[in-house]
Amino acid sequence: MNELRVTFGLFLVICAPSATALASQAAQPSEGLLEGSSLEVLSRNFYLNNDYRSPSPSGKNYTREWAQGFITSFESGFTSGTVGFGIDAHGFLGVKLDSGKGHSGTGLLPVDQEGRSEDDYSSGGGALKLRTSRTTLAFGEMTVQTPVFDTADKRLQPEYATGLLVDSREIDDMHVLAGHFTAFKNQDASTSKGNFTGYGVSTRTGGIDFIGANLFEERPVGGALYASQLSDTWRQYYGNVHLKQSGVFLDGNLYHTRDYGESVAGAIDNTAYSLAAQYTAGAHGFTLAFQKINGDTPFDFVGGDSIYLANSIKYADFNGPRERSWQARYDLDLGSYGVPGLKFMTRYVNGRGIDGTHAPQGGGYNPFDESSGEYVPQQGDGGRHWERDIDLRYVLQSGPAKDMSVQLSHVVHRANSAQGGDDIDRLYIVIEYPLKFGRF
């Protein structure tokens, strides 16, 4: 049994009796299994257009998909008693509206063996949950949000993970999360698989474990500490410190990753950090950020949003080996100008200094190419790139379609050959309408 699982086991042993003791002293009132339940159906209409200005890895110059999705989420309440029981469930249906054989591959829809977008796909899942005092234990398929493992929601369907999650608030100003996950459902898949994939890793056994805490979440000064372990691949540690005060937000993030066990991705010794400062004055927000990757391999992660560094943005993560990047961002809330619900954002990130030629030979970031008889690093020496994002989002404030949102996003990314990324112009149009049925 590895060290992180021992830590996780000790957490459960310690947490369970303390929670039971607290509950026996003053059990939380429960609304009931059905009385505390809620149901929501999110309608998501998604158009994604990729215009490649240089040859893409797939050989396509242009990909485009338009699809309609329906995401149903049910959350039950808990039964009464010292230990309450409940269930959460979710379902998804995605339907193709427009695409073709030459235009598939945006990630909105699955692709069949002939390279065509499938007409539709669906999935479902759920989790059993137990609550005692201020601690909840869930087992099954769910979304996860932590800095070391975070399922993304960037396309038509959210990502899901299957496993065990403990969520505890027994101590004031401390939100503890611990988990063990063994399967993952990608954004364009109907079923979960027992593999976790990143930039240079693919592990099919054991899964991922983590434990950590968010500290002083509702106070001006807060932070977080987490540790995770990807089976036979790496151990990763994360720390955060942030300050919110009078229109100023300062945020610092740090990751350290070392290879572990069988080291299936090769040797890894990587430290990544970012520093961001935001100033808000009325309707205007101004942000500057700096990010640095120290190590011969990229900063890698599994789970689509498991990177809380400041310069991980719409298209690129700016996480190449030895890469340094900076960001300038501007936000405008047009509610102050008579259009409540309308927000605008633009940002620019520039990264350079990438050198992937020192990645360990034979590892996931510098594999051996049998056809050429040479090692081929993912990135060369002198890599550089930049990205510019423009977002416009409007949320209806009243009327029959209240809470419906329309988002228009445009992304431009340019890179040299050593960076290895695409020269791409990308357009997103996303329309969402949540139907909330409240509590039963």
Q: Across the structure, where does each feature detected by a protein language model lie?
A:
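C-terminal structural cap/anchor segments
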Residues: 301-393, 397
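Repeated loop/turn-to-beta-strand initiation elements of outer-membrane beta-barrel proteins
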Residues: 81-85, 134-138, 173-177, 185, ...
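Outer membrane beta-barrel
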Residues: 74-105, 114-193, 215-217, 221, ...
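Solvent-exposed loop/turn segments connecting transmembrane beta-strands
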Residues: 151-158, 183-187, 203-205, 227-238, ...
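Outer-membrane beta-barrel translocator/channel fold
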Residues: 95, 174-199, 246-325, 417-422
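Transmembrane beta-strand segments that form the barrel wall of outer-membrane beta-barrel proteins
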Residues: 45-47, 137-151, 176-178, 211, ...
